[in-house]
């Protein structure tokens, strides 16, 4: 029984990565840009209906809702060769098209105004599913629409569909370069509060690390947005392969999430992928074995989140799930796991078992691949807290100077006071503290002392 997933794409970033994701899924399932199954796509072993549904004339339509407060990106999608793929009723552009002006408050209050229209679309999609498992939200936390409208939607989805899973692919801003959005630290922190309280699982896509990987590993001097988005769509499609090419394990979203998230608040995941090459010569000298792939996945340079060194805290893995695609002998997997444990290649939490799981998945038969084996690691690692710490530091700098607060005061939620900002700062601080506590053996009783 397929458990359907509805994808919500928000704002410029969310719609751009969503667009790449659907392009990738179409290629993997042998679906043309118009949604028609290609003649060569005869293998019936994949499950298309988790992410697509079939219209009356048999062509496939993504279970996707495209939302934006300004038209530029969605118009570019509608002028692309994939324009006919989407259901036009599932596209929502705000009437006045002014956008959220990179302001979380404006994005949030726009959400309140257009709430009815958006949920008409979402409810209709949900009613069209046989057994909806949950929602996947693509957005960035730095701008206005992805952060503000995204936060509003996360809160409402929890109220409206309390039993459905909500997973997000959240793009974190690049810390290495100056941002063109001056209020980004405010936007990020306000969104982080909702990601902590209203999402079941957050896959963190860190622009700093994605840029580093594109430059170091793919040898692209100044990576463009679309090149970074291709990296992201690789991660998104690989993390959903077990849902689309089901095996006997991890073939639904809860199965994926349950193995990675033992305690509810620590649900921010980092990803790693290998082999990442655009260089054909590397393919000819490297033999990709399961052990090779699994060992490379544990190397920091392949991980798509940049975390600083922390001398005070001995950061560790809470859980790892490796999704290995390709020609794989299961006995090899067992040997590789043993080797990783014997050599202590990964440092695990002191209060629970070393949870490293492997899901084997078929590759799409329709896409040529330069590598026999490729792997995606989804990991719950305590060092992700350093990303939240740098968000807090940037926020504190602005807050201390009272910078740019005027822009927020215009919105209803901040009209009388900035209580919402203080509360968000507290929630993120509690999250950081809990990640630090998870590195210690007494974490099991953590939190009971404070109540």
UniProtKB/Swiss-Prot annotation:
<dbReference type="GO" id="GO:0005525">
    <property type="term" value="F:GTP binding"/>
</dbReference>
<dbReference type="InterPro" id="IPR003008">
    <property type="entry name" value="Tubulin_FtsZ_GTPase"/>
</dbReference>
<dbReference type="GO" id="GO:0000242">
    <property type="term" value="C:pericentriolar material"/>
</dbReference>
<feature type="binding site">
    <location>
        <begin position="142"/>
        <end position="148"/>
    </location>
    <ligand>
        <name>GTP</name>
    </ligand>
</feature>
<dbReference type="GO" id="GO:0000930">
    <property type="term" value="C:gamma-tubulin complex"/>
</dbReference>
<dbReference type="GO" id="GO:0007020">
    <property type="term" value="P:microtubule nucleation"/>
</dbReference>
<dbReference type="InterPro" id="IPR008280">
    <property type="entry name" value="Tub_FtsZ_C"/>
</dbReference>
<dbReference type="GO" id="GO:0005881">
    <property type="term" value="C:cytoplasmic microtubule"/>
</dbReference>
<comment type="subunit">
    <text>Component of the gamma-tubulin ring complex (gTuRC) consisting of TUBGCP2, TUBGCP3, TUBGCP4, TUBGCP5 and TUBGCP6 and gamma-tubulin TUBG1 or TUBG2. TUBGCP2, TUBGCP3, TUBGCP4, TUBGCP5 and TUBGCP6 assemble in a 5:5:2:1:1 stoichiometry; each is associated with a gamma-tubulin, thereby arranging 14 gamma-tubulins in a helical manner. Gamma-tubulin at the first position is blocked by TUBGCP3 at the last position, allowing 13 protafilaments to grow into a microtubule. Interacts with alpha-beta tubulin heterodimers; the interaction allows microtubules to nucleate from the gTuRC.</text>
</comment>
<dbReference type="InterPro" id="IPR002454">
    <property type="entry name" value="Gamma_tubulin"/>
</dbReference>
<dbReference type="InterPro" id="IPR000217">
    <property type="entry name" value="Tubulin"/>
</dbReference>
<keyword id="KW-0493">Microtubule</keyword>
<dbReference type="GO" id="GO:0005813">
    <property type="term" value="C:centrosome"/>
</dbReference>
<keyword id="KW-0206">Cytoskeleton</keyword>
<dbReference type="InterPro" id="IPR017975">
    <property type="entry name" value="Tubulin_CS"/>
</dbReference>
<dbReference type="Pfam" id="PF00091">
    <property type="entry name" value="Tubulin"/>
</dbReference>
<dbReference type="GO" id="GO:0031122">
    <property type="term" value="P:cytoplasmic microtubule organization"/>
</dbReference>
<dbReference type="Pfam" id="PF03953">
    <property type="entry name" value="Tubulin_C"/>
</dbReference>
<dbReference type="InterPro" id="IPR018316">
    <property type="entry name" value="Tubulin/FtsZ_2-layer-sand-dom"/>
</dbReference>
<keyword id="KW-0963">Cytoplasm</keyword>
<dbReference type="InterPro" id="IPR023123">
    <property type="entry name" value="Tubulin_C"/>
</dbReference>
<keyword id="KW-0597">Phosphoprotein</keyword>
<dbReference type="InterPro" id="IPR036525">
    <property type="entry name" value="Tubulin/FtsZ_GTPase_sf"/>
</dbReference>
<feature type="modified residue" description="Phosphoserine; by BRSK1">
    <location>
        <position position="131"/>
    </location>
</feature>
<dbReference type="GO" id="GO:0005876">
    <property type="term" value="C:spindle microtubule"/>
</dbReference>
<comment type="similarity">
    <text>Belongs to the tubulin family.</text>
</comment>
<protein>
    <recommendedName>
        <fullName>Tubulin gamma-2 chain</fullName>
    </recommendedName>
</protein>
<keyword id="KW-0342">GTP-binding</keyword>
<comment type="function">
    <text>Tubulin is the major constituent of microtubules, protein filaments consisting of alpha- and beta-tubulin heterodimers. Gamma-tubulin is a key component of the gamma-tubulin ring complex (gTuRC) which mediates microtubule nucleation. The gTuRC regulates the minus-end nucleation of alpha-beta tubulin heterodimers that grow into microtubule protafilaments, a critical step in centrosome duplication and spindle formation.</text>
</comment>
<keyword id="KW-0547">Nucleotide-binding</keyword>
<dbReference type="InterPro" id="IPR037103">
    <property type="entry name" value="Tubulin/FtsZ-like_C"/>
</dbReference>
